[in-house]
């Protein structure tokens, strides 16, 4: 099945502690049905100091389930994603506006 959300898409969080936050998808894990969104679902990781890197508390964006994300349309509102054929090509489009993504 084709991916409704892809790397680089602007999304909004629908549920959880970060509900309402917006960000850009930095990576998608289709097998786990999760995505990492910039600035969302941040966890603090404690890193030990090494000769090459400084130790301390490091903020890291953790994966969030794809069902808790919605794509932002041109108006900045959450939308569902649909697929249609334009000529020979299958394209994604925003269900609220009908615009091709």
Curated annotation (Swiss-Prot):
Signal peptide: none annotated. GO terms for biological process: translation. GO terms for molecular function: rRNA binding; structural constituent of ribosome. Disulfide bonds: none annotated. The keyword Hydrolase does not apply. GO terms for cellular component: ribonucleoprotein complex; ribosome. Keywords: Ribonucleoprotein, Ribosomal protein, RNA-binding, rRNA-binding. It holds the Pfam family KOW. InterPro entries: KOW (IPR005824), Rib_uL2_dom2 (IPR014722), Ribosomal_uL24 (IPR003256), Ribosomal_uL24_CS (IPR005825), Ribosomal_uL24_KOW (IPR041988), Translation_prot_SH3-like_sf (IPR008991). SMART domains: KOW (SM00739). Belongs to the universal ribosomal protein uL24 family. One of two assembly initiator proteins, it binds directly to the 5'-end of the 23S rRNA, where it nucleates assembly of the 50S subunit. One of the proteins that surrounds the polypeptide exit tunnel on the outside of the subunit. Part of the 50S ribosomal subunit. This is Large ribosomal subunit protein uL24. The gene is rplX.
């Amino acid at each position: 099945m084709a991916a409704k959300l892809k790397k680089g898409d602007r999304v909004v969080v629908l549920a959880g502690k970060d509900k309402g936050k917006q960000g850009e998808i930095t990576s998608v894990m289709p097998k786990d049905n999760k995505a990492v969104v910039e600035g969302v679902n941040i966890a603090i990781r404690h890193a030990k100091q090494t000769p090459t890197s400084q130790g301390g508390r490091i903020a890291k964006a953790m994966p969030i389930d794809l069902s808790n994300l919605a794509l932002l349309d041109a108006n900045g509102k959450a939308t569902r994603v649909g697929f249609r054929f334009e000529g020979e090509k299958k394209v994604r489009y925003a269900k609220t506006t009908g615009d091709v993504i």
